[in-house]
C-alpha cells in the first residue's frame, strides 16, 4: 500500500513538474515576443504581452499607473521612435509558477541606444487569461 501511495505521489509530482515546465516555456515565449516587437519598434506588438484591462498595474519612476491604455500612452511619450526605444535585452533571473494560472518573473533589462544604455530590474506578475499568459502587474526600475 505504501509503495502504491509513493508511486501515485511521484506521478503527481512529475505531472506538476511537466505542467510547470510548459507554463514557464509559454511565459518565456510571451516575453520573447515582447522583446522582438520592441526591437522592431512595434509598440502595439509589445503591448500584446500585457493584459488589455483597466486593472493592469504598471509601476515605474512615476509611481503606480493603472490600465492598458495609460501604460501604452506612457510608453508612446517615453519612446516616440526607434532611436528612443533602442534595442531591448533582458535576462530572466527567476520564473516562479505559483499555481496553474499565476506566476512571478524577476529579471534584468537593458536598452542599448546610440548615446546611452539604461538598465534596471523588473518584477512581473503574469496570469493565464483565456489560456494565454499576460502581464497583469509590472514593476520596472
What residue spans do the PLM features occupy?
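A short gly/proline-enriched turn/hairpin at secondary-structure junctions
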Residues: 53-66, 80-83
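Surface-exposed, charged secondary-structure patches
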Residues: 70-114
